[in-house]
Amino acid sequence: DCIINWPTTWQASIRLGQKLVSEGVIGKVYRFQFRNPDSLGPFSYGQVMTDRQLGKEWWHQEAAGGGSMLDYCCYGTILSNWYLGEKPLGVYGLKANFNHRFGDAEDYASLMVRYPEAVSILEGTWNTVSSGYDSGPIVWGEKGALIVENGGDHGIHANVSVYHDRYSTTPNEVYSSDDYPLPAGRSNLAEEVFHHLETGEPLHATMDLNNNLWSAAMLDAGLRSSRSL
């Protein structure tokens, strides 16, 4: 088996959000949005490095696979496909380097993805001092909107809020991820792999190789598209 691990797979709030969407809490979905939480990019929170030193790191070199699109938009691709339950038809990519001019890789990127019945907007940035609002997933449907709160500490104790009323800033329903914990015996990577090997049951959808190949294809299409500007 080829197994792909994502930190977001182990956030109960993200799984809860997908569960509610699949149950039709906000009706037919037409838009999905996700961006990474606060980040100023690689090496921003440890030992201080000069611009010259940072520029020599592969993270900031496009030819080496650096840049915020591959670093952070990847999370959005796997989550978007999972939440929407569809495969994409096309991807439009945009990238720019606003604050990390010592390298040629982008520090901001976005993907707009077209699905048969929906769209998704996925962002990856190394320029966010403070998000200002929850980075999601945020999902819009015919009956309202759903917001997965970040909750700090990688989504632990986070809520999922559902809005049904027009112009309302107060959610109609609030679900605590504490009430919907990860499955017993499958709450981390090791347990999930052991469970799969012992029972033969499929891995979580976000860890499936085929699903991740679709994510890779979306990123590749986004990179190619961004170079056409």
Pin down the residues of each PLM region.
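Predominantly a Rossmann-like dinucleotide-binding segment in NAD(P)-dependent oxidoreductases
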Residues: 3, 8-102, 229
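Short glycine/proline-rich turn/loop motifs
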Residues: 59-61, 171-175, 196-201
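Acidic/polar loop patches that form or flank catalytic/metal-binding clefts of enzymes
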Residues: 86-93, 119-121, 145-149, 204-205
